[in-house]
């Protein structure tokens, strides 16, 4: 729990020492994403999977959870929930926008226990396709760009790519993502690029929806696997399909991280879908946000623990 006093100190530190976040980022103790290839084969799942907590929704204007449109609006509450999650030994890291990464770095310096040391940190990149906007599928890079990822010494970048073949704006985002992959992987020491490809469509009311059918997911997996001049550093972030996960994830040899979403009161069903999908050979872990940080019963620690044990059975 982040007390009012601690949060006030964070606010003061931001106002009076804006340079501090970069200093802390550059001194952060990093770790590899996974164990080195030559260390595989020990029989343990240690070092072969990743469990990341996601907190990049607010920057896209998506602050609702369940039936509460303002659930993620209180930053102190959000940070408290994230610190609870990141303190779990089964959580390997974070996916977030610059503001949240910096908040957590600063909080760590104030408490004397870094929240992001020995964690994998992915920076969220394109947040411009605001939730519910008329231009939602035209999703430009408005958060971390390539230079920002390297300057803050993060471990990777994340791109969202929703593809609706009936909406020309999707093509703009496909190009943005391909260009970002090219720039990131052309650096002397490339970073991982996590791409979240989602088959999208508009319902009768014009609302954007995601199609999780096997056929639709296989189609976008094929498209994204070929983006950019190399796929060597590309990871896929995908929802559990509505059926037949092994068939879906057989569409590519690229590593996959499952996403969470907002399950409402169907959290147990979501956990079961993760457990089933985790059996596919390419699935290497989980990236979950609202489903664990704002569960229906508000037991953040309990839900994070259950998810961690799906990803890391040896816990």
Feature names for model-found ranges:
Residues 1-113, 120:
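N-terminal capping/small domains of soluble enzymes
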